Amino acid sequence: MRTHYCGHLNKSLAGQTVELCGWVNRRRDLGGLIFIDMRDREGIVQVVVDPDMADAYEVANTLRNEFCIKLTGEVRVRPESQVNKDMATGEVEILAKGLEIINRSDVLPLDFNQKNSEEQRLKYRYLDLRRPEMSDRIKLRAKASSFVRRFLDDNGFLDIETPVLTKATPEGARDYLVPSRVHKGSFYALPQSPQLFKQLLMMSGFDRYYQIVKCFRDEDLRADRQPEFTQIDIETSFMTADQVRATTEKMVREMWQELLNVDLGEFPVMPFSEAIRRFGSDKPDLRNPLELVDVADLVKDVEFKVFSGPANDEKGRVAVIRVPGGAELTRKQIDGYAEFVGIYGAKGLAWMKVNDRAAGMEGIQSPVAKFLNEDVINGILDRTQAESGDIILFGADKANIVAEALGALRLKLGKDLDITKEGTWAPLWVVDFPMFEEDDEGNLHAMHHPFTSPLGVTAEELKANPAAANSNAYDMVLNGYEVGGGSVRIHNAEMQAAVFDILGINAEEQQLKFGFLLDALKFGTPPHAGLAFGLDRLVMLLCGTENIRDVIAFPKTTAAACLLTDAPSLANPAALEELAIAVTVAKEKDAE
């Protein structure tokens, strides 16, 4: 039906007759001539309908926005004075010879010329996707996927599919369960990742695997999470962690170069402990120069228990952030930040303004200065390299609370005060994660997943002191987002059983849940390692947006609902009966 896309027309086609299909973006009637901005997925071109073309003119008179049309016309170069430099096709226009309405449109429930509510956009997503901004994002996603496949194919990786109906495994989030009609009372789980299957593929001899695959997690949502998401899943045999990182870093660097013409440069490598110490996060945004500075040794002997208590607690921490120029913050703003860190468990936010460094104690303004002697204050000022006009913000609590609260505050200050260098890129690798993390009850949990190999210890050494072990894991971080995570995997049954033991999974449960894996590890398993990228998050960054819903064609809401199709919905009672499932809905107790 068409010979060209609207957005591909240029001066080289002058004099040629073209056939276009698309939508009416705008129609204008100017002194007899009718102008139509015609749009398709590749862009917009201006169409001129002259009254001399009687049939086309008659049709053009009836056109309204979003009518689907077919046009036959001649490409002609615009006069220099009429060139539209804001349009890719602005040097040409189409003189209409034939015009056909393929389909009419009702009045749209969305207004493409103003901001629509997200609820309306998701309910009428098929219309929202017509907007050039959204269309460009989906096209960039397609280019990113195509690039990944091409890169991995060229590097000897095999695209292999893994099952979608599988078995539940403990990977940190709740599973989406699918009832079996044949095996009544039993359930499949939709995969949170293809983790075990890709490891089994390594045991099968396919030493370089990849898959762009849908994964599912029934977890609380936020701007960069969805219940179903797309993963670039990669696994290799006989490659070290350094080699896996080098290969995947090359892929991301070349992707940014091809799609954005941006050179990310070589990625720095930072241990987990340094990331937490300096930035309060294992995914630090290095565009933000603010850092956490430890001062526990300076305040451990003060009488102010708010500081000295955590400073003398082996699980406590006292740290500060120096904010250049922050002395201009008002008390109301500081109180707002104190309320903000409270979200993360902090009990308050002590502060110290350095109004005049040269004036000594007279130049300090702080509600806690009276509890600190001059040597302590000078020590803090020297360590943070504070200058006149700065403010110092304190965190004193359990180490994890200080890291989380000040880490989040650091990001907020970066945005609020324009400290973060927007429009730049700051990638890095974070490595040497703890093997396990402890919950409030003192139980150990795998920090990544239970198939991650420990770093440099035997199974016996790991069991003797699991809390001290690091894992051979690595995360790729870009502008404060974890875009990919991976590890060297456990490749012998003894080590895998040891990890399960530490996690409190007894021998019987190991066989029930992971017997197939433990058996497979007995048959000459090669050393293997891998990594998985979140495609949605990568594309979100490529597009310069902050919400992955902007780069998914048909996303869910933060309540995991599809407003377009009204999913999830109640099941047919007959289908439930066939599945031998009875549904009970828990009701909240009436307020007393």
From Swiss-Prot:
It catalyses: tRNA(Asp) + L-aspartate + ATP = L-aspartyl-tRNA(Asp) + AMP + diphosphate. Residues 195-198 are annotated as: Aspartate. Its EC number is 6.1.1.12. GO terms for molecular function: aspartate-tRNA ligase activity; ATP binding; nucleic acid binding. Transmembrane segments: none annotated. ATP binds at residues 217-219, 226, 482, 534-537. Its main location: cytoplasm. Catalyzes the attachment of L-aspartate to tRNA(Asp) in a two-step reaction: L-aspartate is first activated by ATP to form Asp-AMP and then transferred to the acceptor end of tRNA(Asp). Homodimer. HAMAP family: Asp_tRNA_synth_type1. Belongs to the class-II aminoacyl-tRNA synthetase family. Type 1 subfamily. PANTHER family: ASPARTATE--TRNA LIGASE, MITOCHONDRIAL (PTHR22594:SF5), ASPARTYL/LYSYL-TRNA SYNTHETASE (PTHR22594). This is Aspartate--tRNA ligase. It comes from Vibrio campbellii (strain ATCC BAA-1116). The gene is aspS.
